[in-house]
Amino acid sequence: VELVKYDNKSDASEAFTLATKLMTSDGVVAVLGPATTGNFKAVIPVAEQNKIPVASGSATGDDVTVEFNEAGEVEYDENGKPTTLKEYAFRICFNDSFQGTAMAKFAANNLNATKAVVIADSSSDYGKGLAKAFVETFTEGGGTIVSEESYVAKDTDFSATITKLTGMDFDVIFIPGYYEEVGLIIKTARAQGIDCPILGADGFDSPELINLAGADALNNIYFCNHYSSLSEDPTVTSFIEAFKAEYNAEPDAFNALGYDLAKFVCDAIGRADELTGEAVKTALENTENFTGVTGSFTIDECHNPVKSLVVISLENGEQASATNVSLD
């Protein structure tokens, strides 16, 4: 397999241009990436037009592989196939709704929480989608949302929001957002005496979180992720050892997802009837029981992986435990 690499500079228009070049000039039979939801969605029309599959390791937006109707649901035909499926788009990561739902169940089932506060990033689809799924699942399970607060990306002062919460009665705080703001929110909450469990999603996963919040504040923290370095699974441990030997660094979830993505696509190329985009697409659709660093999965009818996630706990800023959570 020959690899052709380009840098989309985290820009949607650049991703579109490079995807076009890969498919029309370079003659590829599959494209890996882009990593983010917005950039990945930008290349899907190119994939559909040229009948070349694109697969992402980390685009978690719910509507990446299929469009939803006005009720927020996927419509199916009489054969059980989504009517608005993006035929040439695939991913190997779970989506935002899955994370929100899983963390709501974890709060109720593992932490015995019945009352929750949500502090969401209202400036991103990521934050809004996670918040919606968490609230729906938590309340459907009999829980109460005591308060829903919001912020926008780049905010730095959260004292007013946290002060408002100090007079309320709740068991957990769920913060669907990215580490840049999350670290400051946690730091402020702990400084004002709020010591309850604080929950989040894969946006927590960054070494910068400890720099922003401080190790002392990062206790009783739980967030879901695609994998944990605490795993004793031989597939995971061998990957970590090989990564450290090659790069002299600890691999994060994005490294693990990138590795699995390459293996996933190469596996499909090896199973394809011929080396064409259409044949590789069919092989990707027929993937069953693929074993990767981020877990084993089968591709479903919406081109999403059916897999579990890992809930990681932090104590003094370090990973203390990892719990596999499935929605089965």
For each feature predicted by the language model, list its residue ranges.
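Surface-exposed patches in mature extracellular/periplasmic domains of secreted proteins
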Residues: 1-2, 33-34, 115-121, 148, ...
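Segments of small-molecule ligand-sensing domains
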Residues: 245-255, 266-319
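Short, well-structured alpha-helical segments in soluble
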Residues: 9-29, 105-109, 156-169
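Hydrophobic alpha-helical
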Residues: 37-48, 156-163, 168-192
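Extracellular/periplasmic periplasmic-binding protein-like sensory domains
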Residues: 61, 186-259, 315, 319-326
